[in-house]
Amino acid sequence: MATHKLLLLPGDGIGTEVMAEVSRLIDWLNKAGIASFETEHGLVGGAAYDADKVAITDATMALAQASDAVIFGAVGGPKWDGVPYDARPEAGLLRLRKDLGLFANLRPAVCYPALADSSSLKRDVVEGLDIMIVRELTGGVYFGEPKTITDLGNGQKRAVDTQVYDTYEIERIGRVAFDLARKRRNKVTSMEKRNVMKTGVLWNEVITAVHDREYKDVQLDHQLADSGGMNLVKWPKQFDVIVTDNLFGDMLSDIAAMLTGSLGMLPSASLGEVDAKTGKRKSMYEPVHGSAPDIAGKGMANPVAMLASFGMALRYSLDMGALADKLDEAIAAVLAKGLRTADIKSEGTTVISTSQMGEAIVTELQALHA
């Protein structure tokens, strides 16, 4: 049995609480002989700043580079609002993405049947929803130069952000989306704004070319990003895999998140290039929710997104898809029994703590393996 090296970075706020439930799961998998994991722990975000006056140390980055997957909690909180800009908690997350070359962000939006009534949309619109949004993570307007605010000297200022994409950046994110679709329902929807943006024109051309050259078996369609956002709310189950740029992906994934009822349910993955020699890629897995300092330490945090993020690591980095499927089944079964953390409670359900939810999911997984 192969041993997988994991780096656990709990971070700040509820990050430590939800990561404890991943550790619980890993401990059981090791003891049961189902898998073999070696884990390292590190500081990131505000916790790293308190210890070392940086958002992540070089030593922790070295551990990340050497790991098979990084499991990340959450960073930030008002405690660190006054720290230097380059040492702010979020800088640790940005350095991990940059130094590991994580260009593809995978954001699934799944609505469990037991939670269909928690969505702001009607049950028949969201029940059974299963979308994967593939967001380009290292290019586009967030990173393009120049990025300036200029004083024009006449009482006015001018702000400039630059949207830039090269062909190779679009090709590689397109391949990630098409490869995912082949393992799902075989459909990709590409979203951009080709009607008003030159980057949208190039995006459309390159995605189409990659499809026609390498993925003719996958259904491809195109939507403008604004109408795509409308369709996510109007008829979300038309989508399988959505591929889009950094800016639109940021927006569309948050829209999709709210279809499911709670940010506490949503995992994510960030993937790098496949190494030609090893066949592996750098990767990081994290819940979509933040550090939620208002509930930190109260045992109220929902650990499902964190556990589901670990499930994505099993699937996309560790070649343990069958175990990932069982973990998904265990989560669904616990929810079907009416067990809830406070963020997803509803009439007739039982509210339990963070640790109780984690324990219930591991117990359900044990039963599935019995």
UniProtKB/Swiss-Prot annotation:
Substrate binds at residues 97, 107, 135, 226. Its main location: cytoplasm. InterPro entries: IsoCit/isopropylmalate_DH_CS (IPR019818), IsoPropMal-DH-like_dom (IPR024084), Isopropylmalate_DH (IPR004429). Its EC number is 1.1.1.85. One of its GO terms (cellular component) is cytosol. The keyword Ribosomal protein does not apply. Pathway: Amino-acid biosynthesis; L-leucine biosynthesis; L-leucine from 3-methyl-2-oxobutanoate: step 3/4. Gene3D superfamilies: Isopropylmalate Dehydrogenase (3.40.718.10). NAD(+) binds at residues 77-90, 290-302. GO terms for molecular function: 3-isopropylmalate dehydrogenase activity; magnesium ion binding; NAD binding. One of its GO terms (biological process) is L-leucine biosynthetic process. It catalyses: (2R,3S)-3-isopropylmalate + NAD(+) = 4-methyl-2-oxopentanoate + CO2 + NADH. Keywords: Amino-acid biosynthesis, Branched-chain amino acid biosynthesis, Cytoplasm, Leucine biosynthesis, Magnesium, Manganese, Metal-binding, NAD, Oxidoreductase. Binds 1 Mg(2+) or Mn(2+) ion per subunit. Its cofactor is Mg(2+); Mn(2+). Catalyzes the oxidation of 3-carboxy-2-hydroxy-4-methylpentanoate (3-isopropylmalate) to 3-carboxy-4-methyl-2-oxopentanoate. The product decarboxylates to 4-methyl-2 oxopentanoate. Belongs to the isocitrate and isopropylmalate dehydrogenases family. LeuB type 1 subfamily. Homodimer. This is 3-isopropylmalate dehydrogenase.
